[in-house]
Each structure stands twice: as C-alpha cells, then as structure tokens.
C-alpha cells in the first residue's frame, strides 16, 4: 500500500517557540514492503522532489533504530531503558554531547555506560559516509550488531547513491532518533 498526502497537521503537545500548533506536512507512506525497496523509494522520492524544487548540495541523514539498540546494549544499558535513552539522545543537536551525558546521569544511568555510549558518537562524528560508519560500528560492536542490520543500511545507501538524480549527500547520523511515539 502506498499513499501520498499533503495537508494540515496539529501538534498534540504545547508548541515550543517558533513552532505552530497547526502546520502543513507532506507524507509519503509505504506499508507491506518487507525489503529495503520501500526505504530506497522514499529517500529517492524525497530527494528528487527537493532537487526539482531547485535545491542543491543538501544533506539527507539516515540511521537505523536497530543500530541504536546495538550501541546501547554494547554500552551496558538495559533494553527497558532504550526509549528513555533515545529521547535524550535526540536532543544531541541542541544540548551537545556534554548535555546528553549530564541528562543521562541525572536519570540515574551508570557513568561507565554513559561514557562508553557517548564515546561511540564521538568516534563516529567524522564518519559521515554510511558504509564507513556502519563498518566501523560493526567492527567495534561485534556481535551486538547483527550483520544483517549492518548490511541492510549499507544496501539502502548504495542503492540511493547509485540512482540519485539530485545533488545531495547521504549521511550516516547515529544521533537521528524518531520513533512512532514521536508522532
């Protein structure tokens, strides 16, 4: 099932400064496709549209939630805490590495786990290429990161880069976190 829609959306929470309760959003949804084709098609449709609007040299950031889970497990966090940890991680672009460390510490997580977790992000900050970042993590995390998961994200990046028809860079961003609860 594929759907494309443009329409009004309303925020359930109290809008922060610079945000509106109601805004217009474009949605592309694909349901029922078990392979990576849906991901590839969504990224391609998005980049094609942005390119046709005249934008050049833009960046598309991608991540894989299962990689985040592997990073958290490797660092010693319990699975029941992942959602809370990821909500804090999602603030990285606003509060920085130190802010994330402080907030995780305030939430009562072990300093050793926090340090080990955030060290991964520090080591990844200059590895923007998807294949390079994923390969680094696979090597570092070992069995915590399933080879199939690593191959899946690399396959998506390879296909998107091979078929791109706009001027953009596909970037691996392990701080990119959005779950269904966000929406």
What are these regions (language model features)?
Residues 77-102:
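Acidic, His- and aromatic-enriched active-site or binding-groove loops in soluble protein domains
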Residues 1-56, 100-183:
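Positively charged, Gly/Ser-enriched RNA/tRNA-binding surfaces
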Residues 21-24, 59, 81-84:
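Short, well-ordered strand-loop elements centered on a beta-strand within folded domains, enriched
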């Amino acid at each position: 099932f594929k759907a494309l829609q443009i329409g009004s959306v309303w925020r359930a929470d109290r809008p922060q400064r610079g945000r509106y309760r109601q805004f217009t959003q474009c949605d592309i949804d694909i349901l029922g496709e078990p392979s990576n084709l849906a991901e590839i098609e969504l990224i391609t449709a998005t980049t094609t549209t942005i390119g046709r609007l005249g934008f050049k040299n833009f960046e598309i950031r991608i991540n894989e939630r299962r990689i985040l889970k592997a990073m958290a497990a490797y660092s010693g966090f319990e699975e029941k805490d992942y959602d809370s940890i990821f909500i804090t991680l999602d603030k990285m672009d606003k509060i920085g590495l130190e802010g994330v460390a402080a907030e995780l510490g305030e939430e009562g997580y072990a300093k050793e786990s926090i340090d080990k977790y955030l060290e991964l992000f520090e080591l990844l900050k200059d590895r923007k290429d998807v294949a390079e970042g994923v390969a680094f993590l696979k090597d570092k995390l070992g069995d915590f990161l399933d080879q199939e998961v690593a191959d899946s994200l690399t396959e998506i990046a390879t296909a998107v880069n091979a078929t791109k028809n706009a001027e953009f860079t596909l970037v691996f961003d392990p701080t990119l976190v959005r779950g269904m609860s966000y929406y």
